[in-house]
A protein has these predicted regions:
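N-terminal small-domain helix-loop-helix segment of the aminotransferase-like
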Residues: 8-100, 107, 282, 302
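Short, solvent-exposed loop/turn segments at secondary-structure junctions
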Residues: 35-39, 102, 126, 173-175, ...
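Conserved core of the PLP fold type I
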Residues: 61-198, 202, 208-226, 297
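Conserved glycine-rich beta-strand-loop-beta hairpin in the small C-terminal domain of fold type I
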Residues: 278, 295-305, 314-319
């Protein structure tokens, strides 16, 4: 049978990231292209223990349908985790458990963009965001990066343009692909511009927990008093990516639209994975686990920088 693929999907390109990952199975190749977390950082024993306990003691809790927002007790555990150092989730914010952060990017575009609308993105930006936004018909407006984050004058020019963007997508902590971290001053300025021009910020934070040097910089969401910031947090780098678990924190009015998008997409996130994550958050010392992950990456980073300095002294890179 000949299938007539829709115009929208014919214009979409396969995920570059997935194509890169295919090459990583080649035993003759050492690839630095994919962002696979270190396998020795996965808490496999804890996951196995909690999974076995759950399936033996309360299998229905893991195997039955659940609400689209996420299991209520899981959402409370995630809210507490997100708020343990700074106030990410406030009274007017909802928490949605999603099937990875990619789903949050997809929902933001679906809920905020019409065909032909503009989305502002850092330039360069995370490749995985491109298809998520373009699948909803969005056009991308790139904003150049500087060493301390996005160029503010360029960002304001995009915000002030006749075709005002529907939102601004950024990764303030260890930006993908540059590795740069947005300064506190620029985060405050980005938030001020967002409020002034009425452009929401989609703050993607998959790497914030992995800081191996220096002090954490407050998230843009922690500054949010107007419901202007959509925060995407992920468990892929601090638990494991195969569980496909992330969480979105945003104003409850927008969250209602995200929940409908969730119902149309996959009904709800894997309940077993949610329950195991809840056990990890409430019954283990997650901060101690994250400290061990940082040690793993600190050693890898030190070796990588040593080799770059020795073998590629002409190369400039983000430390």
């Amino acid at each position: 049978m000949e299938f007539k693929i829709s115009d929208k999907m014919r214009n979409m390109k396969p995920s570059v990231i997935r194509e890169i990952l295919k090459q990583m199975s080649d035993p003759t190749l050492i690839s630095f292209a994919g962002g696979n977390p270190a396998a020795d950082s996965f808490p496999a024993e804890d996951i196995a223990r909690f999974s076995d306990e759950l399936l033996r003691q309360d299998p229905v809790a893991a195997l039955q349908y659940s609400v689209s927002e996420g299991v209520p007790s899981v959402r409370e555990a995630v809210r507490a985790f997100a708020n343990r150092r700074e106030r990410v989730a406030k009274e007017n914010d909802g928490v949605l458990i999603t099937s990875g952060s990619q789903q949050i990017l997809d929902f933001a575009a679906k809920c905020l963009c019409n065909e032909g609308d503009v989305v502002a993105v850092e330039n360069p930006a995370f490749l995985g965001a491109f298809n998520a936004f373009r699948s909803s018909g969005a056009r991308l407006a790139g904003v150049p990066m500087e060493d301390d984050g996005v160029n503010l004058a360029a960002l304001e020019a995009v915000f002030a343009a006749p075709e005002k963007p529907r939102f601004f997508y950024c990764i303030p902590n260890f930006q993908n692909p540059t590795g740069k971290t947005m300064s506190l001053a620029k985060r405050r300025a980005v938030y001020a511009l967002a409020v002034r021009y009425g452009v929401p910020v989609l703050e993607d934070d998959p790497y914030g927990e992995l800081r191996i040097a220096g002090e954490p910089v407050p998230s843009i969401k922690s500054m949010d008093t107007e419901g202007a910031v959509i925060y995407a947090g992920s468990f892929s780098k601090i638990l494991c990516p195969g569980m496909r678990l992330a969480y979105c924190v945003c104003d409850k009015k927008l969250m209602a639209a995200f929940v409908v998008a969730k119902q149309c997409s996959d009904v709800h996130t894997n309940v077993w994975a949610q329950r195991v994550c809840e056990a990890m958050l409430t019954r283990t010392d997650m901060d101690a686990h994250i400290r061990e992950i940082r040690k793993i990456y600190a050693a890898k980073a030190a070796l990588m920088m040593e080799q770059l300095d020795e073998k590629c002294p002409q190369v400039r890179y983000t430390r």
